[in-house]
A protein has these predicted regions:
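Charged, amphipathic alpha-helical segments
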Residues: 2, 7-10, 55, 96, ...
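Residues on the solvent-exposed faces and adjacent turns
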Residues: 177, 210, 410
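Extended Gly/Ser/Thr-rich low-complexity repeat segments
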Residues: 127, 167-178, 230, 237, ...
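Short amphipathic beta-strand/extended segments with alternating polar/hydrophobic composition
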Residues: 95-105, 144-148, 192-194, 219-220, ...
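Structured, hydrophobic secondary-structure cores that serve as assembly/anchoring elements
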Residues: 1-100, 125, 203, 244-262, ...
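Conserved, function-critical positions that sit in or immediately flank catalytic
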Residues: 106-199, 232
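Short small/polar-residue motifs
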Residues: 68, 139-148, 191-194, 201, ...
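Short linear motifs in intrinsically disordered
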Residues: 16-17, 71-72, 104-123, 165-166, ...
Length: 592
């Protein structure tokens, strides 16, 4: 070819990352998890890992509507679920028990019977005695505890209630012979406690904090002979330090399930080659994370406030604090600095403690109301309506949370104490303009007239209602239970969206089937269905050939229009989202 310049146009479109758009959002109580901080689940096993599935109340095992809904949603093809946990009262996280390094703290261990092997010369009368020690030499605070003598020379238990301070290996504690209530006029010898390394608590290297809140996260208890924790459960955690290396300043951290044991450890997460050196790429806060999410309620629009420099990479814990950071652990020759080697955690295992909060009503509050027994007496699954308020307000934040439809199974529009929150949910959906609220109008065993009358009080094309209640199999307990329709409608939408598109009607025998429903509360006649549809309530119908089926797709808009149909409303929502996302890229660009 002859010399010249060839001009070639290479069109590379700009692709911008958009906020995560999830399918369904659900607000309700769960067994565990962060309180009111929405979290995305991508499978039912992911949901159970974060939020649990069953709980015990009054010796009975239950599941929340939230868990039943999540199970059915993912079974039907749902891929993303935004969960917001609501609770009753104050909830806090659990923190790790002492995570020791090799530096002694001078405090005696408070673990039951820890100093039992250090006792000598015990004589006295069988009884329980309080021990109060005051130091006669050295500095520090004397320990206190209790000792139980089962006979004149046998100690069945000794407990340290306060570990004091200033103790070291080889120090002795004397319990005066006259303090143990000797009988028969016989005075025994003094009881001597000679402290060894196992009796003295080492300093804490760092502290972990659970992401989940509530007393269910407390696993602290004395280890059994097989290494199990009596308070350990499938829902809480324990920790283990392995492979500490003082030459490199590294160690491994295992997060284990609370109900495992030494022979069969159930390891949930493993973090290898961690460091306490903030300059290291494996610094523990960088690898695990240290961020805390709180809800800011000081303004009319609630939002999630984030503190901490490192995003949480663990699904279960964050680093609350590092007691002794080891800045530049190695010196210029590659050797560990002498002052830092004692800061590395030693091989050990422990549990979590200090969490507070439960949704299980106490004896004075009476038993919680679950499944079809929920009523208007201000007790729905152990909660009251006001417990939902913050979560509902937060999820009105369109900029932070994107979802296609939202439910609050357990809140009933007709319940006087629930009306305000249901009204807020409906108003939020309309104001956002990008989501559909699925609500329940009446409680179990309501009449058709009550349902239609309640529906007529609503005029909103961003809201849909279904009736009647349905019976399904609780996947976690095996019980056949009645649930409000909003518990299972997300699964119908999920199947519709997986099999077709959002602008197809999520109804009828092709896309409105409810295969996990055993029966509807009531078998609707053609006249019943007509009456419901006139009131814009979508009937859940029982057909002899196809089973339980959603046989309606109306919104609760009174005036006849295109948006009184769910598929049209969802189509317009989808169009607004897509056009809005594209238009954002054109703001401040040349448009003339």
């Amino acid at each position: 070819l002859s010399p010249g310049v060839i001009s070639i146009e290479n069109d590379q479109p700009i692709i911008n990352t958009q906020p995560i758009q999830v399918g369904a959002a659900i607000i309700g109580p769960t067994v565990k998890g962060p309180v009111e901080i929405p979290s995305i689940c991508t499978s039912y096993s992911d949901y159970v890992s974060k939020y649990g599935n069953t709980f015990t109340s009054g010796s009975q095992i239950y599941s929340y509507f939230t868990s039943i809904s999540a199970y059915n949603y993912f079974q039907a093809g749902g891929t993303t679920l935004l969960v917001s946990r609501v609770t009753s009262g104050s909830f806090t996280t659990a923190t790790s028990t002492n995570l020791p390094n090799s530096v002694e703290s001078g405090v005696i261990s408070t673990e039951t019977n820890n100093i039992l092997s250090s006792l000598t010369g015990v004589t006295g009368s069988a009884a329980t005695y309080v021990i109060s020690s005051s130091a006669t030499s050295g500095v520090g605070i004397g320990f206190t505890g209790s000792i139980i003598l089962s006979d004149g020379t046998t100690v069945s238990s000794i407990t340290t209630t306060s570990g004091g301070s200033g103790y070291g290996i080889g120090d002795t504690i004397t319990i005066n012979s006259g303090s143990l209530g000797y009988s028969g006029g016989t005075i025994g010898s003094n009881t001597i406690i000679t402290l060894d390394a196992s009796n003295i608590v080492n300093n804490n290297a760092f502290t972990l904090e659970t992401l989940s809140e509530g007393e269910i996260m407390n696993s602290i208890s004395n280890r059994s002979t097989d290494g199990s924790l009596p308070s350990g459960s499938i829902d809480n955690l324990r920790w283990e330090i392995q492979s500490p290396d003082i030459n490199e300043g590294t160690f491994s951290l295992l997060i284990r399930r609370g109900n495992d044991d030494t022979e069969s450890p159930i390891i949930l997460e493993t973090f290898n080659n961690l460091s306490l050196d903030p300059t290291s790429p494996n610094y523990i806060e960088k690898v695990i994370g240290n961020q805390v999410q709180t809800i800011n309620t000081t303004e009319s629009e609630f939002y999630v406030d984030l503190t901490g420099n490192y995003a949480n990479q663990s699904q279960y814990v964050r680093v609350k604090s590092v007691a002794t950071p080891t800045y530049e652990y190695l010196d210029n020759t590659g050797d560990p600095k002498t002052g830092f080697t004692g800061s590395i955690p030693i091989a050990s295992t422990g549990s979590f403690e200090g969490a507070t909060g439960t949704n299980i009503p106490g004896p004075s509050a009476g038993a919680g109301k679950y499944y079809e027994t929920i009523n208007n007496t201000n007790n729905t699954q152990g909660l009251v309506s006001s417990d939902y308020t913050t979560a509902i307000t937060l999820l009105a934040n369109k900029e932070e949370f994107r979802y296609s439809y939202i439910t609050v199974p357990g809140l009933i529009k007709d319940f006087a104490t629930h009306t305000s929150n249901i009204s807020s949910l409906m108003a939020n959906s309309q104001q956002r303009g990008d989501t559909l609220a699925i609500i329940d109008l009446e409680d179990y065993q309501s009449t058709l007239l009550e349902v239609t009358n309640e529906a007529k009080t609503i005029n909103n094309s961003y809201v849909a209602a279904y009736w009647p209640w349905v019976q399904t199999l609780d996947p976690s307990t095996g019980q056949q239970v009645f649930v409000p329709a909003s518990t299972l409608i997300p699964s119908v939408f999920a199947f519709n969206d997986a099999a077709a598109e959002v602008w197809f009607a999520p109804a009828g025998t092709a896309r409105g089937g409810m295969p996990t429903v055993l029966r509807a509360e009531r078998k609707l006649t053609k006249t019943n269905r007509d009456d419901l549809y006139k009131a814009n309530v979508n009937p859940i119908t029982t057909f002899n050939t196809t089973g339980i089926t959603v046989f309606g797709q109306k919104t609760l808009k009174k005036k006849k229009s295109a948006t009184d149909r769910i598929n049209v409303r969802r189509l317009l929502i989808e169009l607004k989202i897509q056009i809005g996302n594209l238009a954002e890229n054109l703001v401040f660009e040349q448009n003339t």
